[in-house]
């Protein structure tokens, strides 16, 4: 495991014989049934609630602002490599609903309140945010400007 991966993930806390979730990469000519996952962990979160609702388990995960900036209602997030849909969001946490099959086939089945998890946000959102901020990095000669202020200055808004 690369040093950057150790720094950004829960791997530092892994114990001998502890399970991890591994999934094969999607083939380029296969059915696209989820969101684009690069396998690059953006940060970690902590499960703060786990509740059964009918046939689903609802997990609520607390995450740092650096991750929450990319978490949107009905958007996608990967928890320990498992692609899921966000059903609720607050400033510091989000919730996902997991079906029994997913719980049985992944390490989330043994996750409990307090479990630290790896999080990866949707790569499309990361690219959009990056491109929206291009040219707005502050320098001595040029103070930081938002994309909105640039659009207004140039007559687009």
Where do the model's predicted regions map?
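Conserved loop->alpha-helix
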Residues: 1-157
